């Protein structure tokens, strides 16, 4: 009831203005362990059936918040309290940048979807690291999503990723290389096997922490499989599928720029993930994101081969109860099918 009133107010505002107001509140809450514990007591959910050890990290549950919500690692404590099993901060770039011109964030309410053309707006790696350390330690694993600065030419992209990774080496539990945002000109061109190979070979020499590649949903299947194979061969520990889509046919009234996320992406993301899992299940940790908004969809992705999940748009539309609702219902679905834990259900459809 309370969130429905708050949502009505927030949805009367420009989408980015609303997000900024929420961020201010969450940052304030993150400064208070007492308030975070209060949130956790109301909206958190813990069940040993949902716990898992992946890549040496303990995940209280498989449901994470995708990168883009907390761009500067300034409200992670509060977000964890809403029931997430892990979070991904960023996208951080080597240097601070403003991103694209506003308006750049839009709602497609009937489709429960978002369209964003943000352009990696963030305070830069130095301030992101400072903020992360200020609020540490954290109760769940935290990933750091890394991107390329807009002004960096393609020929120097590898150096730029090396620079931002180097600044972030002392924070986070894993790193995700974002080559798939549609909002940085030509960034998706880096989704090729040669660059991906160079990128992960470079990163493996710099850190022993897990490394992930986040891919776009708009790749041709053969291209996607080739790129992922290159990443895994070069040392990637996991693949996150997928980022936002540029397929404007998925909503009734799309804006000219920006990637789409939310329920409009459910089918497309699921189909991409299915192909990914058929080829690489048991070879890599697979993370499914895109259009997940309830336990049924979450469970389907897990049975398809997802060790972990991420949400974003559904959190905007459904509010603070979402994690708790998904996780409670997920436990029921596991029990109904005779699984003793979520770990047993991963890849069940492939066995």
From Swiss-Prot:
Binds 1 FMN per subunit. Monomer. Substrate binds at residues 71, 116-120, 178, 183, 243-244. The keyword Cell membrane applies. GO terms for cellular component: cytoplasm; plasma membrane. This is Dihydroorotate dehydrogenase (quinone). NCBIfam families: PRK05286.2-2, PRK05286.2-5, pyrD_sub2. The active site is at 181 (nucleophile). It holds the Pfam family DHO_dh. Its main location: membrane. One of its GO terms (molecular function) is dihydroorotate dehydrogenase (quinone) activity. Keywords: Cell membrane, Flavoprotein, FMN, Membrane, Oxidoreductase, Pyrimidine biosynthesis. The lineage of its organism: Bacteria, Pseudomonadati, Campylobacterota, Epsilonproteobacteria, Campylobacterales. It comes from Helicobacter pylori (strain P12). FMN binds at residues 67-71, 91, 145, 178, 214, 242, 262, 291, 312-313. One of its GO terms (biological process) is 'de novo' pyrimidine nucleobase biosynthetic process. It catalyses: (S)-dihydroorotate + a quinone = orotate + a quinol. Its cofactor is FMN. It is an enzyme of class 1 (oxidoreductase). Catalyzes the conversion of dihydroorotate to orotate with quinone as electron acceptor.
